[in-house]
Amino acid sequence: AAESGAEVANKDKPLVWFNRQPSSSATGQLDMTALNFNKDTYYVGFDANQGAELQGTMVKDYIEKNIDSIDRNGDGIIGYVLAIGDIGHNDSIARTRGIRKALGTAVEKDGNVNSDPVGTNADGTATVVQDGSLEVGGKTYVVRELASQEMKNSAGATWDAATAGNAIGTWSSSFGDQIDIVASNNDGMGMSMFNAWSKDNKVPTFGYDANS
């Protein structure tokens, strides 16, 4: 966190936070002291929470509008997998929470929605998430986060598209037609999963940001 203005020699100089809002890597809570360092402090980037809520709502709306075809194996469970970019990044935390809140799979941890990766959750017994439910056309469907992980490569780079492409290969081998939705904290990882598996299997894939 930034120190208070009175304690810093450059306290009156303009400060710009770019792309990443200062926040707790554990909870995703914004560091308001840093964001209000002085009267010329600015943040240039996304509104993490608003965008996250929109992504979650888009996924939920898609399921409801395509309920006749979305459940690929007809088991009454809408299963999704989630590529998490960086477990300590506030945008990634917000986007994971946004998906889980919209689909009813969120559980609380220390007063906030738990954004930890679930690993695998084939039977719905994970404690990081819970089974959600959606009622559409008089029928109730279970919504389950089948798997999620942080996409970090062996060199330590997060938000890694290649890792996401490998992950969807592993998940599809494990879950097959239980996977009805693929979701990602960003477009790069989402496109990697789409090209590696979703496209050929006609599984809707949701990303986030502005890759061309």
Residue map of PLM features:
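A residue-level marker of the well-folded mature domains of exported/periplasmic proteins
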Residues: 1-212
